């Protein structure tokens, strides 16, 4: 609505999310169809943990730079309010066997030996399956390898909060942020952050020798 794009056909919409439902297997296409853009606008879904939304921008910019498209939209979409919670592997296998069964007897046989413990759901995590580590833990490894001191990390964090607060105050984001359900700015911003306050925080990832909070 803001940019008058209703019904317009763009070169591409690229979207991504760290945690998404299986029904949103092509999130970019679904976002394009729900946005009011022309349904002829193609969509693609990318995923790279916390760098997903930045990668979608790079993807769109690269296509524009090489002349493949004239315009496009890139972004990310994540929420922990409606994450996909699934059944454990044991119950999933039973349900698949029951779905493939031809007779009532075969369907019932799929649940032979069923235990109520199988109803325990599997909650999604953000740790890599390969390493078992989340982004914060990898950051800890990097800080140790590169000898990045705790006070240097705190200084960067404080400067980040102060710069964002100043940008909001001077109106930098006025024409960049669209209010949604009454929210018009990041709700994790702490303008009163200080080195002294951050120094009191305990490590968030490596509880014994970590420096990241």
Regions found by a protein language model. Give the residues of each.
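Phosphate/pyrophosphate-binding loops at sites that engage ATP/ADP/AMP, CoA/4′-phosphopantetheine
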Residues: 1-9, 142, 146-147
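Active-site-proximal alpha-helical scaffold in enzymes
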Residues: 48-78, 143-172
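Secretory-pathway/luminal and periplasmic proteins that interact with or process carbohydrate-rich
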Residues: 22, 82-85, 165-170
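Conserved catalytic cysteine-centered active-site region
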Residues: 14-72, 114-116, 130-134, 192-213
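Beta-strand segments within the central parallel beta-sheet cores of soluble alpha/beta enzyme folds
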Residues: 7-16, 42-47, 72-76, 152-159, ...
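Flexible glycine-/small-residue-enriched beta->alpha junction loops
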Residues: 70-141
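Short catalytic helix/loop segments, enriched in acidic residues and glycine
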Residues: 1-2, 31, 95
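N-terminal extracellular/periplasmic Venus flytrap/periplasmic-binding protein-like
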Residues: 115, 152-213
